[in-house]
Amino acid sequence: MEPFRIHKGTAAVLMNDNIDTDQIIPKQYLKRIERTGFGKFLFDEWRYDNNRQENPNFPLNAPDRKGASILITGDNFGCGSSREHAPWALADYGFRVIIAGGFADIFYMNCMKNGMLPIVMDKEMREKLVKTDAREQIEVDLENEVITTSTHRFHFTIEKMWKEKLFNGLDEISITMQYEQEIKEYERRVATY
């Protein structure tokens, strides 16, 4: 997993509350287990019309929001069924940071496990962020837990364990591999039959 230290990017805004995992990526696209290739299906039923043409009224399709790597959204983001495909779709689309009023617990953990930083921020602060010019680079500094724009500086908090994993780019496999020697020693001591 790529370490997350400081991220600079533009933001896309989708301030709906209670966006569930089926809205993030509909179930018909969940037939694969690779982590890539899901970005084109992100918010599929909102982004495209019945002819698979981009819906010009959907915020992510706005020309000045293309290429955004920060998503600012509403409360209870990622609710619904627990499918890791939802964070995969967000990451594959290019998002590294999701700022919401709150997240479903499993979705929050799945974001972290896939190298994305989910930030909980109150509505007043998110509304200030939303007013940032679409072309402006927003800086997200994980080490100092700060989001900076040209006019504002916002503090956020993150649990120490998740912060260390993201900062050092550690997923569950790489954490296990840190104990490879101890695991091998244990396996040598265990009786085999």
Curated annotation (Swiss-Prot):
Tell me which Gene Ontology terms the entry assigns under biological process.
L-leucine biosynthetic process
Name the chemical reaction catalysed here: (2R,3S)-3-isopropylmalate = (2S)-2-isopropylmalate
Q: EC number(s) per UniProt?
A: 4.2.1.33
- Gene Ontology CC terms, in alphabetical order: 3-isopropylmalate dehydratase complex
* Signal peptide region: none
The keyword Nucleotide-binding is annotated on this UniProt entry = no
At the top of the EC hierarchy, this enzyme's class is lyase
Q: Which UniProt keywords apply?
A: Amino-acid biosynthesis, Branched-chain amino acid biosynthesis, Leucine biosynthesis, Lyase
InterPro entries recorded for this chain?
A: 3-IsopropMal_deHydase_ssu (IPR004431), Aconitase/3IPM_dehydase_swvl (IPR015928), AconitaseA/IPMdHydase_ssu_swvl (IPR000573), IPMI_Swivel (IPR033940), LeuD (IPR050075)
Pfam families on file:
Aconitase_C
Kindly tell me the pathway this chain contributes to.
Amino-acid biosynthesis; L-leucine biosynthesis; L-leucine from 3-methyl-2-oxobutanoate: step 2/4
Against HAMAP family, the record matches this protein to: LeuD_type1 (MF_01031)
Query: What role does it play?
Result: Catalyzes the isomerization between 2-isopropylmalate and 3-isopropylmalate, via the formation of 2-isopropylmaleate.
NCBIfam families from the xrefs? leuD (TIGR00171), PRK01641.1 (NF002458)
Give the record's subunit note. Answer: Heterodimer of LeuC and LeuD.
* Family as reported in the entry's similarity comment: Belongs to the LeuD family. LeuD type 1 subfamily.
Name by which UniProt lists this protein: 3-isopropylmalate dehydratase small subunit
Q: What organism does this protein naturally occur in?
A: Bacillus cereus (strain 03BB102)
Give the gene name: leuD
